[in-house]
């Protein structure tokens, strides 16, 4: 239900963003705990196995964007420094209640952490401070504007 609302209010159907790490894991901020093969993956900004949420995925899109080696190094430098930080429920509340500083690094909402990584690595231009939230649909727009290609896969529900 929450995922549907995020996609709806985000204007594109996207409700979450993860990034493939060089080790083949998916990295992102989640509010829920996952148990896979006896391993517990807590809520927060962490790496999870590629199949961690297969039972709940209705559709996914893989974006591919060419960046420089320096940008890639900066992306992972910032991302690695955020590992283990808690999930930020204010990201969802921002859809309804408005202004907040989404760049506050104490906790992360998935799309806002991704945006911060990309801004730090100069992949995306820095957004104006007047914008008080970034949702997964915003990330899709930014990626396409930067020249990303994409492949969308649909699943039967």
Residue spans for each PLM region:
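Glycine-rich catalytic cores of cysteine/serine-nucleophile enzymes that process amide/ester linkages
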Residues: 1-66, 93-102
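A structural signal for the main folded, soluble domain(s) of proteins
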Residues: 16-23, 84-90, 129-130, 142
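Small-side-chain structural scaffolding
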Residues: 18, 28-31, 75, 79, ...
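Hydrophobic/aromatic-lined pockets within catalytic cores
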Residues: 22, 83-84, 118-123
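General structural signal for secondary-structure boundaries
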Residues: 35-52, 68-71, 88, 127-128, ...
């Amino acid at each position: 239900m929450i995922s549907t609302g995020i996609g709806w209010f985000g204007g594109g159907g996207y409700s979450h963003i993860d990034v493939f790490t060089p080790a083949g894991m998916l990295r992102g901020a989640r509010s829920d705990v996952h148990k896979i093969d006896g391993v517990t993956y807590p809520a927060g900004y962490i790496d999870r196995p590629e199949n961690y949420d297969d039972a709940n995925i209705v559709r996914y899109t893989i974006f591919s964007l060419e960046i420089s080696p320096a940008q890639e190094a900066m992306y992972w430098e910032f991302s690695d420094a955020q590992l283990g930080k808690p999930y930020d429920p204010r990201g969802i509340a921002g859809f309804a209640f408005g202004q907040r500083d989404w760049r506050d690094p104490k906790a992360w909402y998935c799309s806002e952490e991704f945006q911060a990584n990309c801004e730090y690595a100069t992949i995306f231009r820095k957004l104006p401070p007047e914008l008080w939230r970034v949702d997964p649909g915003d990330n899709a727009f930014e990626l396409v504007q930067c020249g990303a290609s994409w492949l969308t896969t649909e699943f039967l529900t």
